Amino acid sequence: MERSWKKNLLWILVRLHASEKQSVPSWTGFNILVRNDHEVVKDNVGYLPTINAPATNMSTVYEVLTKSLQIKDTLNLQSIVVVFDEALCAKATEIKWKHREQFKDLVLRMGVFHTICTFLSVIGKRFQDAGLRDVIIESGVIAEGSVSGVLEGRAYNRAIRCHKLMFEALNRLALIGFNSWTDEHHKDKKPIVDEFFKGLKALCNKTCEQEFKATVASPSFEEVSRLFGSYMHYLRHGNGKLSKFWMSYVDMVETLLGLLRGSREGDWELHLSSISEIVPWCFAYDNLNYARYLSAYLHEMSHLLEEHPDILEYLRSGGFSVQMNEDNPFGRIPVDQTCEETVNNDTQSSGGTKGFSLRPNVVSKFYLVAEYRSTFLRQLKDILHINWSSFQHKDLQPTRIARDESDVKSIISVLQNTWLNPFNPDLRDLVCLSTGKVATPNVQHDLLQAKDVGEKAYKAFRD
């Protein structure tokens, strides 16, 4: 997690110290640019037969697991990985535990895409009434009619972008205080900090992997990141309750970005450490299904070295996510998200099966040929260049870069000039950023101790 944190910090510093007309893209675009020397190998996505039965039936899940073992044998594999969302993973886990010998060569994984959606809802639930909802509406980042979908994790792309912008805005506010804090407590380090910011111009002017690696490896950045880490610790524990509460937002979004980065870069260790950070929050906010089965998932993954070393090697090589685009070095996505964008998208029909027939034999035929129809549809789209374009991620487009910068500045303006800056040392009580209403002692205790309560529940569940 520390390497991911340093990369995110450097991104924020580069964005903050770029030219007056912002030229450095937001989080995803920046990481694409600083991985320009990485070799990209596109993965092939295959379409499997469709089972004409309710997905949530235990018999259906059992059939999926059985078919997976048949595929393993056909491909002469030692073991095979099957990815489910939480609802199906719970049933599959129960079946595997009941028939351990039969399914000993099968490894179950929890879908990362659906896990992210759940964590987005946890973040929204914790912060929406503390001022987050009002801030993103007032700043114009999210329209009032769309804000519920963002905070509940249903509007995935908008939610991710919203939290990236809020995360960057809060870090910029923290950096304002960091400069004065450094002058007061670490005057002897001021020349090193100034030297780093002077050298940062090279990365601002030429955002590429070579410059990025050189900056990360520099002693001056190591010292700046250490100092900023100390200042963030002060904001968490020595700057009042309001600062502590909103630093938990920064930490939660840091975890969210770590989970995204783990999938996009194929970093298995970062993926596991991010999941372990999410579990206590699921316990704290009563998302018990994910809390229980993510705990089981972490336990299973921690024993892969003894039980399935071949699978562990495959996952460490990035096999737990899928490279859909051959031009994007930061473009791997979770397996369950890949299914949403390929299999589900190509298999669906207008109105479902009821849209063309209610006759059982016709519906049965529809499902029997679904894999072939979907495969041919995907090939036809590729031939006709439907949904195809020369690669340029939208975060790299000048209009999006300008819009992102404008939205970040708008959030900062709302917090500094209209409402409350959560890192203001004069604000010691836990209050709503937009209304200034002080939380009751019971509410303060619940909010500030939420993660500790979640960690205790997680420990009790494991024991």
Kindly give the residue locations of the regions a language model identified.
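Long, low-complexity intrinsically disordered regions enriched in Ser/Thr/Asp/Glu with frequent Gly/Pro
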Residues: 1-463
